[in-house]
Design a protein with these regions (language model features):
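ALDH superfamily catalytic-core signature
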Residues: 1-82, 133
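Conserved C-terminal structural/oligomerization subdomain of aldehyde/semialdehyde dehydrogenase
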Residues: 72-184
Length: 184
């Protein structure tokens, strides 16, 4: 609920539209109810101008003045990998985390907020392998993490099949902190 509008517009545009076909592309945007009326139209209009189709819950549909389709339960599970995005209004960060953990891909999720306590709660409680604060989800890439070219992606908490020793039982969760960075 404590987000900078300019940063949110810039980061969401990059997170969704820079490259829509990668697993780090944003597929759902959640708006805190206290800022929904201020943020929904600028953010979603900007995406729509870039060619993005919007699927929103009934709250978003009431507020958004652009073209919108009503989201359904399947919308929240969909990894579009295209110029489509789902949008929903949530009561608080707890509801946001619950929604993400129920419907998300468990790959990468981000929060835009100036409230460090809220960001810390979000990053700690999402089940995603990468949690991002105030930066684009498009940074979710092996090369950006210094791992070199990716050979695969795992969102599982358990190690791969085969012999398992102590080293194979380690699972990582990455937290990325930013101040409005986008990926070029």
């Amino acid at each position: 609920k404590k987000a900078k509008l300019g940063m949110a517009i810039k980061v969401l545009e990059n997170a969704k539209m820079r490259n829509t076909g990668i697993c780090g592309a944003t597929e759902t945007v959640l708006f805190h109810k206290s800022i929904a009326k201020k943020f929904i139209n600028p953010l979603l209009n900007n995406l729509q101008k870039k060619g993005c189709n919007i699927y929103g819950d009934s709250d978003v549909k009431k507020i958004f003045k652009g073209k919108i389709s009503l989201a359904n339960k399947r919308s929240w599970h969909t990894e579009y990998l295209s110029s489509n995005i789902s949008a929903k209004v949530v009561r608080d960060v707890y509801m946001a985390v619950k929604h993400i953990n129920q419907y998300g891909t468990m790959h990468t999720d981000a929060i835009i907020t100036s409230d460090k306590k809220t960001a810390k709660f979000f990053l700690k409680n999402i089940k995603s392998s990468i949690g991002i604060h105030n930066s684009s989800t498009q940074f979710a890439d092996g090369g950006e993490f210094g791992f070199g070219a990716e050979v695969g992606i795992s969102t599982n908490n358990l190690p791969p099949r085969g012999p398992v020793g102590l080293d194979q039982l380690v699972s990582y969760k990455y937290e990325v902190y930013g101040n409005g960075q986008i990926r070029k």
